[in-house]
Amino acid sequence: MKTPVELAISGMQTLHVQHRGRSGYRVKVRPSYVDETLFGSPAGTRPVPPDFDPPWMKKANRSRGVGTGVSQALGANGSCESTSSSGSTPTLTPRKKNKYRLISHTPSYCDESLFGSRQEGAGWEAKWMARGDAAKLHALFWTPPATPRGSHSPRPRETPVRCVHPADLSKTEHRVMASSRRLSVDGLDTPRPLRRERSHSLTHPNVPSTGHTPASSPCTSGPRDPRPAPSGVTFRSPLVTPRAGSVSVSVPTTPRQGGATQKTKPPWK
């Protein structure tokens, strides 16, 4: 009967034999890039990964780099099946030869901002374009004109902008004062004329908002006195402004059509 020590020694020997067999089997497997990066190279020699050149590299540099990469890969892996020359791509490299790949790459604005300025000899014309058409090419830096041109413009460029003449404002004031005076003569006691006066606030800036009706204002048939009342009351009729007094002098031109002439006293006398 074996002692526990002998049993332990024999178990260790069997485990060692199994480990030898498994390790010898794993050496024959071709190492992948995942196993090398995670667990290291089993044989101690790691093949050089393929280098990817940018498309604007010259053809001589790319062929030289491919040749050195192929020689190193063949030296590291003796069991490689590809026995082709150094110019051809090996089976280990994932890059394949593509006939549509750009060899002479013309740098764009993105390439200039990322990888430097543009080359001196690079042109913007295509190979199938004529020389006359290539001379017409220019960069697309276009901004719209500041003013519209042609018939779509609302105003020609030669005609200046017309400004509002002060005489037009005086005519509108005459018209507004005549209409408001006609309403006050008709005897409308509703606060509607006040609302009308408020709507013409641009022509009457000094009109205060009061609750009195125009019937409480002084006599509308005679000439108005632009001077304030002797009492200290700050109330002012909507029509007794300095501007309204000056306008009311020139307004009574309509009674002349009836034949009776009315002479008004100027406000400065």
UniProtKB/Swiss-Prot annotation:
GO terms for biological process: negative regulation of Notch signaling pathway; neurogenesis; Notch signaling pathway; nuclear export. Residues 128-156 are annotated as: Interaction with RBPJ/RBPSUH. Residues 79-93 have a biased composition (Low complexity). GO terms for molecular function: tubulin binding. Keywords: Cytoplasm, Cytoskeleton, Neurogenesis, Notch signaling pathway, Nucleus. Residues 202-220, 247-269 have a biased composition (Polar residues). A motif (Nuclear localization signal) lies at residues 92-108. GO terms for cellular component: centrosome; cytoplasm; nucleus. Residues 156-269 are annotated as: Interaction with tubulin. A motif (Nuclear export signal) lies at residues 5-17. Residues 67-94, 145-269 are annotated as: Disordered. It is found in: Cytoplasm; Nucleus; Cytoplasm, Cytoskeleton, Microtubule organizing center, Centrosome. InterPro entries: RITA1 (IPR031418). Interacts with RBPJ/RBPSUH. Belongs to the RITA family. Tubulin-binding protein that acts as a negative regulator of Notch signaling pathway. Shuttles between the cytoplasm and the nucleus and mediates the nuclear export of RBPJ/RBPSUH, thereby preventing the interaction between RBPJ/RBPSUH and NICD product of Notch proteins (Notch intracellular domain), leading to down-regulate Notch-mediated transcription. May play a role in neurogenesis. This is RBPJ-interacting and tubulin-associated protein 1. It comes from Bos taurus (Bovine).
